Amino acid sequence: MDVMRIRGGTPLKGVVKTQGAKNAALPVMASCLLLKGRTLTLENVPDLHDVSTMLDLLACLGVTMERLGNRMTFSVPEEISWEAPEHLVRKMRASSLALGPLLARCGKTVLPLPGGCSIGSRPIDLHLKGLMQMGAKIEIRNGIVYAQADQLRGRRIYLDFPSVGATENLMMAAALAKGETIIENTAREPEIENLASVLRGMGVTVDTEGTGCVRIKGVEEVQGCRERVIPDRIEASTYVLAGVITGGEVTVDDIVPAHMDALLAKLEEAGVRFHVGSSSVTVFPVRRLMPVSIRAMPYPGFPTDLQPQMVATLTLANGVSLVEESVFQARFLYSEELNRMGANITIKGDTAIIQGVERLQGASVRAMDLRAGAALILAALAAEGETRIDEMVHVWRGYEASDKKLKALGADVALEEAEEK
Ligand code: EPZ
């Protein structure tokens, strides 16, 4: 179903349960490629298009999988393919997370460079640089990466940018490298810790320290293990903002509150009242937000994956808010769609200037990427009248059953097929 229709204006009320984190599930699924003739079992795997794409990739490489509810078992044979199929890598950038484990486990891999997307170019130069420092020979011909390494060797690696994917690829490569690898200036997103737990379960010594430095002692062979995917802090935050933007009372369950500190701090600044439980947060009705200034940056800063949703929420604030995007070059394309709904957003360089308005009006809009689509849904929930959101395929990549979850909170939501073009 590629179109979502929302009739806005209803304050949302009720409880919504958070899915397993997309951005934790994808790397830990890729880590199964390190196994030889063993099994990885993951609990709390979300049912998302991106997860299905990763499953297709793993199946192409020779992994057999079994899903029982949100428990997934990955059985990896002694021999697997080391060539990642082009159509899957082009479809999802996270396929590049096969690079590190395949190279470490097979000694070679062939993987197309991932394409860019609507939020900017998405190179993997930091991934490749780290692998070459560990002894890999890497060539790029016609957009395909040819990597070869008889034995990766542990060493100190400094990341020019705390890239999430580069951190994850190098951690997985280091698991089978000879000796110790120390990665400096790593990403510190909670998803990194989830991957570290899986590698520890596989018998690898991983010391993350939580300070942006990861120490890994490589092993000859990794063991099978079982791990749980952490809750999706971005999905959870999106539903918190659905409560805020509609002036409702929403409880988001199954979260790790500490993973949402940056959002909660900004909501407190904006005058939102909320209660934080051990694994839930409840937001209470607020008439109108106060404007705030935000800089989207690597964790523990305000998450770039929540920047579009926060901008949508601030379109109705009582004053001028500023939101700077410091991670991606072009993550404001959705603002034009919000302005078509009556928002007043001006983009100056890497900053959105949001002049709060009294109300938004429903319109026909288009989701350009996953989080842009989420931002449009939030705006539609608050807007007067009906909004039609096209290209929902982007939203299904990262939000499990969002129509059902929103309906359960009282939203007037309907899905339909796009007309034949
Ligand atoms: C992960 O992408 C997430 N995806 C993204 O979530 C998230 O926005 C991003 O981290 C930042 O938090 C998954 O985990 C599957 P990066 P990733 O490497 O690993 C540049 C979503 O909405 N860079 O931290 O690709 C890059 O161009 C998605 O769920 C290089 O220049 O992000 C970008 O500007 C969107 N060279 C910045 O760093 C590299 O080798 C952050 O990239 C790698 C990255």
Which residues does each predicted region cover?
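Short, structured segments at the rim of ligand-binding sites
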Residues: 1-421
